[in-house]
From Swiss-Prot:
Pathway: Isoprenoid biosynthesis; isopentenyl diphosphate biosynthesis via DXP pathway; isopentenyl diphosphate from 1-deoxy-D-xylulose 5-phosphate: step 2/6. This is 2-C-methyl-D-erythritol 4-phosphate cytidylyltransferase. Keywords: Isoprene biosynthesis, Nucleotidyltransferase, Transferase. Its EC number is 2.7.7.60. It comes from Escherichia coli O7:K1 (strain IAI39 / ExPEC). It catalyses: 2-C-methyl-D-erythritol 4-phosphate + CTP + H(+) = 4-CDP-2-C-methyl-D-erythritol + diphosphate. The gene is ispD. Catalyzes the formation of 4-diphosphocytidyl-2-C-methyl-D-erythritol from CTP and 2-C-methyl-D-erythritol 4-phosphate (MEP). HAMAP family: IspD. InterPro entries: IspD, IspD/TarI, IspD/TarI_cytidylyltransf_bact, ISPD_synthase_CS, Nucleotide-diphossugar_trans. The record marks 20, 27 as: Transition state stabilizer. The lineage of its organism: Bacteria, Pseudomonadati, Pseudomonadota, Gammaproteobacteria, Enterobacterales.
Length: 236
């Protein structure tokens, strides 16, 4: 797919199962309203005019995606994902064409706001390394004693942020950092951690705390509430 330097490709790793949801259906295929969580997440990306192409990495044995309208969307490419998130992202990057910048967004994070996305995308004008949406930690944080559910000490929350998605980086830089980190056995929990491993310092762009990831059963009702409220606000 041809792109310009202003166009962005989004990669959505959707090969996971999400056992903490305690359902037989992978969480990205659970429904909120008349759409799956995955559809909500992808449509939020495509709503921005700079996002011209979305690559979705699914499990090789996935039979559910083909049943969605997304399967026939002209701006969407599907690739086989890997066992780990980083493997799926790398597979997505290989299908990202010549886009200079890429977004990586959780398949199960359906409540992305357009103003947050716009501020994140603006980093391509000011940064060479990109950045992530994140929310400052507001709760008191406790460190547990090793191997015990007992408090070791309170962690200073000043300067602590919850990492969110999307995360936004130059495509080649992200590819090189992910590849190096995996080859060297580094623990990669998100895309920013791969850049950190390679000595880069991505920017933090404050995003809304209601941009939640559906991970546990109780998150589904909360995401439905946030989405319903957002749709109501947009229509009034």
């Amino acid at each position: 797919m041809a792109t310009t330097h202003l166009d962005v490709c989004a990669v959505v790793p959707a090969a996971g199962f999400g056992r903490r949801m305690q359902t037989e259906c992978p969480k990205q295929y659970l429904s909120i309203g008349n759409q799956t969580i995955l559809e909500h997440s992808v449509h939020a990306l495509l709503a921005h005019p700079r996002v011209k192409h979305v690559v979705i990495a699914i499990s090789p044995g996935d039979s559910r995606f083909a049943q969605l309208p997304l399967a026939n969307h002209p701006q969407i490419t599907v690739v086989d994902g890997g066992e780990e998130r980083a493997d799926s992202v790398l597979a997505g990057l290989k299908a990202a064409g010549d886009a200079q910048w890429v977004l990586v967004h959780d398949a199960a994070r359906p409540c992305l706001h357009q103003d947050d996305l716009a501020r994140l995308l603006a980093l391509s004008e000011t940064s060479r390394t990109g950045g992530i949406l994140a929310a400052p930690v507001r709760d008191t944080m406790k460190r547990a004693e090793p191997g015990k559910n007992a408090i070791a000490h309170t962690v200073d929350r000043n300067g602590l942020w919850h990492a969110l998605t999307p995360q936004f980086f130059p495509r080649e830089l992200l590819h090189d950092c992910l590849t190096r980190a995996l080859n060297e056995g580094a623990t990669i929990t998100d895309e920013a951690s791969a850049l950190e491993y390679c000595g880069f310092h991505p920017q933090l762009v404050e995003g809304r705390a209601d941009n939640i990831k559906v991970t546990r059963p109780e998150d589904l009702a909360l995401a439905e509430f946030y989405l319903t409220r957002t749709i109501h606000q947009e229509n009034t």
